[in-house]
Amino acid sequence: MKKRWLCGTMAVVIGAMAMAGGSGGNSSSSASAAGTEAADSGSSVDTSGAEMTIRVAHVCGTGSPYDYGANAFKKLVEEGSDGRIKVEVYAGDMTTDEVECVEMVQNNNLEIGWVGTGALGGFVPDLGIFELPFLFEDEDNVNKALEGEFGNSLLEQLSAVDGITGLGFHEDGWRNILTKDKTINTVDDMKGVRMRTMQNEVCVATYEALGATPVALASGEQFTGLQNGVVDGTDNSALYAVADGYIEVVNNICDIHHYYSSGIIVASSKWYEGLSEEDQKLVKESAIKAGEEQRAWFLENDEAKIAEYEEKGYTVTRPTDIDAWKEKVAPVYDKMYAAHPTWEGLVEMVRAAK
């Protein structure tokens, strides 16, 4: 799902980059040409001594969680190469969307994209598994799963797509339930609650299983939907609820972490394969490390944001009947296993990653 975070300042940058042949400015022109030349030749040219600039783009604004991760990657690559490789981060609301950002990467018009898994579901349907409720136990389970067999399996599938190389995972946040009037403390409190959801088979089935009434609304309609009573609640991390503004029209936060949203750092295969083995290793390891740093940053800052709004007078509940919630949504797993036979094995990988 596309997020808007202080967006607007970079509205036309990515489109302009594509029209200009991928140049993100004078500093990136020679680097882009060098990377493209190596890729076009189909050779394994040793670029380990060459100066270059890597452009990283995402659809969120400066200071967003995506931007934090992209800049962590920038720092790691620049320090790891002793300044030989420069990284330019393009943060802002693009005139396109995340899917088009992925297509730019795939077409070698952009080196690296920082995107959500939703933008990649059309390429790898198994990425839809992140919508399963209570898939992960906690952050430790997330880290071990993404860095182990589960994550490797998904990255391998993605890297088999023509033009795309999956480098690693980043964070899109734990989602909690935010409601305008009704306080949610137990699973029974969900009965009859009109919950905004994406038009997604897993999310719709989940809220139906919980006894709520799912209402499909676009991300940008959440504020007015809550304000006008079209829906009673929505779900997201506190950070994004604040960024998107609808934290101002809810009064309750159910800190339950029922969904975990992930993102993936994708690279242009043509560009990446044109790098030396040394530079490939640096880029890959930096992406993985940046993802780890961003996940830790996101969790800490999201919890701090919840505490901040609790101090402001918001009602914050932390349900203890998690097993009852999981029991309610168990049929969703059975339904999705029937529709997506590969998901059961992937869930087993997650469960084993402890």
Where are these regions (language model features)?
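N-terminal secretory/targeting leader peptides
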Residues: 23-27, 42-141, 150, 159-354
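Signature of the catalytic double-stranded beta-helix
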Residues: 145-155
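Short, low-complexity disordered leader/linker segments with a strong preference
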Residues: 1-53, 354
